[in-house]
Swiss-Prot record:
Record text on subunit structure and interactions: The 20S proteasome core is composed of 14 alpha and 14 beta subunits that assemble into four stacked heptameric rings, resulting in a barrel-shaped structure. The two inner rings, each composed of seven catalytic beta subunits, are sandwiched by two outer rings, each composed of seven alpha subunits. The catalytic chamber with the active sites is on the inside of the barrel. Has a gated structure, the ends of the cylinder being occluded by the N-termini of the alpha-subunits. Is capped at one or both ends by the proteasome regulatory ATPase, PAN.
Record SUPFAM superfamilies: N-terminal nucleophile aminohydrolases (Ntn hydrolases)
Cellular location(s): Cytoplasm
Propeptide residues per the UniProt entry: 1-6
Regulation of catalytic or functional activity: The formation of the proteasomal ATPase PAN-20S proteasome complex, via the docking of the C-termini of PAN into the intersubunit pockets in the alpha-rings, triggers opening of the gate for substrate entry. Interconversion between the open-gate and close-gate conformations leads to a dynamic regulation of the 20S proteasome proteolysis activity.
Species of provenance: Sulfurisphaera tokodaii (strain DSM 16993 / JCM 10545 / NBRC 100140 / 7)
Organism ancestry: Archaea, Thermoproteota, Thermoprotei, Sulfolobales, Sulfolobaceae
Name the UniProt record assigns to this protein: Proteasome subunit beta 1
Record GO terms (molecular function): threonine-type endopeptidase activity
Active site: 7 (nucleophile)
PROSITE patterns documented for this protein: PROTEASOME_BETA_1 (PS00854), PROTEASOME_BETA_2 (PS51476)
GO BP terms, alphabetized: proteasomal protein catabolic process
Amino acid sequence: MEELPATALGIKLNDGIILAAERRLSYGGFVLSRSAKKVFKIGRFGIAGAGIMGDIQTLTRLMNVEIKYYEMYNNKPISVKAAAKLLSVILYQYKWTPFISELLFGGVDDEGPKLFVLDPIGSLIEDNYAAVGSGARVAIGVLESEYDPSMNLDKGKEIVLKALKAAIERDVTSGDGIDILTIKRDNTSSEDFIKIF
């Protein structure tokens, strides 16, 4: 499969998770937008992705509804793993006409922070850090050399920025700013945008 345009990455730390992605939307080397948000908060969870923007947005909306339905029907919060598995099942249902996206899904529950990687047909892998999209090969090199699960969230943001900036330098389909979603162990979250020139 051809690499999907964009770069998104996530890291799991003892204090929470960080999801991030750059903002350039491009197809076939043509820049369509410099302000495409690829990191979304869904209740207590976060999702980031690379690929077809409409597919990522559709999956985000579907997950928002499915999570609310699950929690209302079962009268309890859904775990990160169960929510990720639900996303995996949705992706697998469309295996013959797949959503063209690679996704990172994460959050914090009673078991602590969790990060999952999903491909277009629903393969589900739990990991400590991951990068997806056309700039993933560059970004993962930075994450592998600098990742430490015990680092604090501020240091984690620095590493995420360093990895995405490295990917932006080498990948023409990535650029124009970075969105960062941080979900802390107490389930509070923050969203930041860093403009890159």
